[in-house]
Amino acid sequence: MELKVIDAKGQVSGSLSVSDALFAREYNEALVHQLVNAYLANARSGNRAQKTRAEVKHSTKKPWRQKGTGRARSGMTSSPLWRKGGRAFPNKPDENFTQKVNRKMYRAGMATILSQLARDERLFVIEALTAETPKTKVFAEQVKNLALEQVLFVTKRLDENVYLASRNLPNVLVLEAQQVDPYSLLRYKKVIITKDAVAQLEEQWV
């Protein structure tokens, strides 16, 4: 499998031979769906909560007598039937949303995503990703020269200047190879990987 190598202006300058096991795998939509769902579920903080009828601050006085008013019987205003009453089946912050994905599935999923990106010509290789100064304006110009709008950069080791210069750009994300996840790969229109990061990804996932 060959991946296109681009220069600083976004022009194709050559190609890089890569592992077929990682970049030429058949697409498995069901597996990708499961990986992304698990990633998003595991990212949940689980802090949502509502109150039960016992926890809502209301008077326990009976609103009106049981019989003779013609209205439906009612015990207290904290009932779930009442406006501003408690919830019948409230969410609690101790809910566990964790979904486990075994290593074999995760490797296969990452490989199928990278392979599809390569087939769709959304995946490119660049020699290196550096920034002389931690200036967002300068780095934004570099991204503009690459003719990219929404891009994920993957490097072997994150340069401090690159991190500082890119962190305030809304459509740019820079990750180290060991931090790459399925959701980020699919979220961005283009994925640019440095040559040394390609080697590390092959070492990790093949």
From Swiss-Prot:
InterPro entries: Ribosomal_uL4, Ribosomal_uL4-like, Ribosomal_uL4_dom_sf. Residues 46-89 are annotated as: Disordered. One of its GO terms (biological process) is translation. Keywords: Ribonucleoprotein, Ribosomal protein, RNA-binding, rRNA-binding. Belongs to the universal ribosomal protein uL4 family. One of the primary rRNA binding proteins, this protein initially binds near the 5'-end of the 23S rRNA. It is important during the early stages of 50S assembly. It makes multiple contacts with different domains of the 23S rRNA in the assembled 50S subunit and ribosome. Forms part of the polypeptide exit tunnel. This is Large ribosomal subunit protein uL4.
